[in-house]
């Protein structure tokens, strides 16, 4: 069973929880749109909203390239809170793992990681976190579900 997230164009919904350091769990919802414009380049746009909180939405705009081995990819990301980001991802048998780091003069040395565990062809379980140096600042866990075309 091949991965469908990232590797196929489509729309996905996100529902889960966000946790800030020293904060309570808050509900997060969102949507991701993945498109492929050439055989090895993809674009992905994600919008996360926090319906029960007075917190700004998070917008993520990716541009990535799948390596010739079709098991690794690299990406550039514009993150509405963190700025310009560079990252890499690995496509495992049952999961997609990626890490990223903030570009430029980032005195906080922010970086992050994400894992998407495939539940079935239409659903993934997402976990990820954002770090400053070696300290975890926030984490998110959510179910990502493909929407019909």
Show the residue positions of the predicted features:
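N-terminal helix-cap/turn-to-beta initiation motif at the start of protein domains
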Residues: 1-11
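Central antiparallel beta-sheet cores of small beta-barrel/beta-sandwich binding domains
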Residues: 14-15, 19-112, 147
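Edge beta-strand at a domain terminus
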Residues: 113-149
